[in-house]
């Protein structure tokens, strides 16, 4: 038997307490259908937001990559100013020759001289260079969109490579060249770029398409620009070599 409530000053008996509580609980709880509707709405919103968040992340990574390349460009021009117009060398890509270069702080390769200009730790001091489990962190060496890591027995990881043809040879050489001696406008001469391999130098076939099916390039004048894959890649080992806005080999 349920107790009934009578409102003070009222002539009528109120609803029974048991009936009132039962009615309250029935109205306050979600039905299965209502719960499924809520879940469906959340799923739809998540599906709408994920692409937006993904694009925002990609844009942030691209921005950081561009900033890295601009810093390398700035370091290059400071180096040129301090070294009688001479550019740093492209160096050597892998193995024992690279290691011998890294052990020589006076060697003129870009990966030795430019960090010094920027007052950054030397490349040989980077823990991720030999340890694929090391935290990459935020570094001018690292493009946040590049997932490449060290794979044993490799001892190097370059997310950015220097164009092997800027001196006109198309191969790594060990004689420095002056910026003013390059017969092509510095605004179109490729300097550093997003590296799809791991050596410190490369050509059009080394570029990686990690920024919305494109890549970032720095040029000898210091500016940085993103190009679509179709502008530098044609499926060959060296990529497109006749794009006037991306000059790889500076001497005819």
What is each residue range found by the language model?
Residues 1-32:
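N-terminal leader/signal peptides at the extreme start of proteins
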Residues 7, 38-39, 248:
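N-terminal non-cleavable signal-anchor helices
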Residues 65-252:
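Short, well-structured segments within or immediately adjacent to enzyme catalytic domains
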Residues 9, 21-25, 47, 157, ...:
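Intrinsically disordered, low-complexity regions enriched for glutamine and histidine
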Residues 15, 22, 38, 106-112:
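Phosphate/pyrophosphate-recognition segments in soluble nucleotide-handling domains
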Residues 26-67:
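Amphipathic alpha-helical segments typified by the pilin-like N-terminal helix
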């Amino acid at each position: 038997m349920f107790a009934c409530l009578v409102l003070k000053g009222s002539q009528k008996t109120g609803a029974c307490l048991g009936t009132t509580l039962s009615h309250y609980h029935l109205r306050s709880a979600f039905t299965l259908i209502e719960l499924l509707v809520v879940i469906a709405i959340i799923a739809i919103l998540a599906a709408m937001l994920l692409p937006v968040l993904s694009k925002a992340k990609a844009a942030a990574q691209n921005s950081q990559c561009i900033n890295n390349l601009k810093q390398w460009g700035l370091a290059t021009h400071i180096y040129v100013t301090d070294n009688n117009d001479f550019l740093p060398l492209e160096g050597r890509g892998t193995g024992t020759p690279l290691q011998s270069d890294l052990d020589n702080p006076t060697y003129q390769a870009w990966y030795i001289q430019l960090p010094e200009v920027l007052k950054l730790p030397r490349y040989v001091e980077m823990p991720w260079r030999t340890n694929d489990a090391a935290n990459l962190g935020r570094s001018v060496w690292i493009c946040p969109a590049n997932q490449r890591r060290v794979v044993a027995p490799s001892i190097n990881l370059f997310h950015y490579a220097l164009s092997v043809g800027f001196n006109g040879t198309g191969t790594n050489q060990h004689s420095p060249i002056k910026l003013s001696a390059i017969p092509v406008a510095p605004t179109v001469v490729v300097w550093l770029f997003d590296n799809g391999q791991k050596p410190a130098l490369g050509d059009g076939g080394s570029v990686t398409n990690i920024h919305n099916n494109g890549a970032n390039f720095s040029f000898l004048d210091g500016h940085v620009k993103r190009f679509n894959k179709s502008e530098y890649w044609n499926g060959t080992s060296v990529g497109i070599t006749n794009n006037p806005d991306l000059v790889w080999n500076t001497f005819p």
